[in-house]
Regions:
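Gly/Pro-rich turn-and-neighbor structural signature
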Residues: 171, 175-266
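Mature N-terminal, pre-catalytic/accessory segment of carbohydrate-active enzymes
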Residues: 1-177, 252-253, 257-260
Length: 266
């Protein structure tokens, strides 16, 4: 059909520039690479009870959609979740006191409610640890921006239409799923995350752990403001450079497959 449409356009002196964004082919991507899905890491801080357990429920964001999700194309919603870590600490006027910070994940009870929500039962507050932060990863129906096969898959889509006389290719507003101000919830902090982005972060920062640095970025820590700023800059720069690489690869692939005069548009 694409070949016929392109031929018709050429015959009528019209340039056909279809949208061939891989987000429209998410089912095919996920079928081929089920371990390369984007995750949203949600951090939720709670005040702990002194003498009894504290229960908290963390849920994913509903209707995480845009114009690439609708009709017969599934939304970007969560397909599973995983409690990655629970920290306990004291959060004072100057921020989290690092000496009080400890990993209490193994002491918590976890109950999966559904693909998009989880209940965590946290034990009573320990000495100098009146606060806790649960870190839950929600795997989305969306390709991992840092997935090792994403760029290759993007090019394969274009190659499927190499026999069509297209004037170019477009894709609109590439990047992570949409995140709007209405999604913000007090004491909840969200980061785009995946095992592949964590590996890249460690590589770029000389071995730092993205998961623990997400807590540092989310909540100030006493006497660690400079370290926090560096973590934010490292994370943002890593995301920027990865998306530049993806966009440049798309541009180069369009020119290679459809010719140097092919349009690359949004």
């Amino acid at each position: 059909q694409m070949v016929l449409a392109a031929d018709y356009a050429v015959e009528h002196n019209i340039g056909l520039v279809p949208d061939l964004d891989l987000r429209s082919a998410r089912r095919a991507f996920i079928s081929s690479y089920p371990d390369e899905l984007q995750e949203m890491l949600r951090l939720q801080e709670v005040k702990l009870e002194k003498k009894k357990s504290t229960e908290t429920i963390i849920a994913s964001i509903d209707n995480l959609n845009d114009h690439y999700a609708g009709g017969k194309i599934p939304p970007y919603n969560a397909v599973k979740n995983n409690v990655l870590r629970v920290y306990a600490y004291k959060n004072g006027p100057a921020g989290i006191e690092p000496k009080t910070l400890s990993d209490i994940t193994q002491q918590c009870r976890i109950e999966i409610i559904s693909e998009d929500s989880v209940r965590i039962i946290i034990p009573p507050a320990g000495k100098n640890q009146p606060h806790a932060c649960a870190m839950v990863s929600f795997t989305l129906f969306y390709p991992d921006i840092f997935g090792p096969h994403l760029i290759e898959f993007q090019k394969q889509i274009l190659q499927q239409y190499s026999d069509a006389r297209l004037s170019g290719v477009c894709k609109d507003e590439w990047g992570f799923p949409p995140y709007f101000p209405r999604f913000y919830t007090e004491n909840t902090y969200d980061f785009w995350y995946s095992k592949h982005s964590a590996e890249e972060y460690a590589r770029k920062t000389g071995g730092r752990e993205l998961l623990s640095d997400c807590l540092l970025m989310a909540r100030p820590m006493k006497k660690k403001e400079t370290e926090r700023q560096v973590a934010v800059n490292n994370f943002m720069e890593m995301v920027l450079q990865r998306n530049i690489l993806i966009e440049n690869s798309f541009y180069d692939a369009v020119k290679e497959i459809f010719g140097k005069d092919a349009a690359v548009t949004v």
